[in-house]
Amino acid sequence: MRRRITTSDSGEPVAVLSSEALAAKEARLRELLANYRSVIVAFSGGADSAYLAWAATGVLGQSALCITADSPSYPDRHRQLALTVAREAGLRHEIIQTSELERAEYRANPTNRCYYCKHELYTSLTTLASDRGFAVVADGSNADDRGDYRPGRQAAREFRVRSPLDEAGLTKAEIRELSRRAGLRTWDEPASACLSSRIPYHSEVTPEKLRSIERAEEVLRTLGFRVCRVRHHELTASGNGSPSTLARLEIAAEELPRALAPEIRSRIVGEILAVGYQHVTIDLQGYRMGSLNEGLRLDPI
């Protein structure tokens, strides 16, 4: 079987199935969606959930409702992207407020923090589905997620949330290819996660930290860096002083030379200090998905 080679979010080559095999997976997805009869799609605005929302709308029309969660944990740019995609794709779309920050377990930032976030989200979505007569709640998990540490999947199982992209065997690269063919602007949208993922485990999640992270990442995006993270660290103070904050910048390896150019580096440092950080450092290893998991023994969920 012939495969086309493309690149993943990390720049690594990945195989995409032949057109015939990919069409078979797409047909399987549509069959799954048709069997739902009605569905609420958890729609973050990212590549996976955007494609699922588009496909569900194509199969079920107004019986597909796409819901975007809004809270301090999510960057405003994600909400704006979701609104734009919904408008362009003709989705039936609503935004709801979630309150994961009101949960002490979430704020404590354990290694399974994502479980509490998804538990909050799926509580809201399943209640909404029950109240408004939708048969299924679905998320955008794909086949590549199976071997990863994703505590949110435990919550999905508990609430019987379906993952039709995964069930159809679609990988991230295949979803990007199908999204490109569908004309979705999200086809090459870099993978992302909630802002809390930038805070080391067991360091409290607060609205103030999340705002600082969002503002600092916006500095990098305004300067043209598409794949980037600002990791928020607190440095222990000597004596009785307050801890200081450090922004550790992860930028895609191929973009590091530009970030280190004197003029750009000066702008990065100045503008991120203006956000409120006391220290700014660029991680020479570059961007790594889930870098705060490094060194931890986490089994796939």
Question: Which residues make up each language-model segment?
Answer:
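Conserved beta-strand segments that form the floor/walls of ligand-binding pockets within enzyme
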Residues: A42, C194, E250
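A short interface-forming secondary-structure element
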Residues: S242-S244, R248-A261
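ATP-dependent adenylation/nucleotidyltransferase module used to activate substrates
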Residues: R2-R181, A247, A261-Y277, I282, ...
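Mid-to-C-terminal catalytic subdomains of enzymes
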Residues: L170, E174-L220, G224-R229, S238-P243
